[in-house]
Amino acid sequence: MTEPSRTLVPESIHRDECVSLLGAAALARVVISVKCLPVALPARIALIEGNFVLLASSDPAVILAAERGDVVSLQIDGLDADGLTWSVMASGIAKRATGQSPPNEIMRQAFDRGATFVLLPLSVVVGQRG
């Protein structure tokens, strides 16, 4: 006799844990609209004061979105020790960061290579595990 298949039901991740996962991440997908189509682009990230994410990107579309004050989302995902996957998405109105010094070595390297910093407030933060 075969075992019945186990169906995983995704569970929501509390905002505080989502922010913690964002704080531990160094890389994310920045999700923007380019000519009315969704685009996901890689960017280095750093959590600032638990309320903002600083993105480092050299992509002109990301920089333009920040200069226009577009709604931008970022997404990270991972795998727990027990094999469950998780995903966190944060969204807010982006703005180009001026006068922001690189908060860590990874961001400093991006800045030295010509990346522009974009500040994203954590207006909406959602996550799920499953």
Task: Please provide the spans of the model-predicted regions.
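Short beta-strand segments
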Residues: 25-58, 74
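Charged phosphate-binding loop/patch that engages nucleotide di/tri-phosphates or the phosphate backbone
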Residues: 116-130
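Short, structured beta-strand-loop surface elements
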Residues: 58-116
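Short, structured patches in soluble enzyme cores that scaffold and shape functional sites
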Residues: 34, 76-78, 121-124
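A short, compositionally biased
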Residues: 23-27, 68-69
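Extreme N-terminal tail/first-helix region
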Residues: 1-22
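Structural motif
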Residues: 51-52, 71, 93, 124
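Secondary-structure transition/turn motif
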Residues: 56-61, 122-124
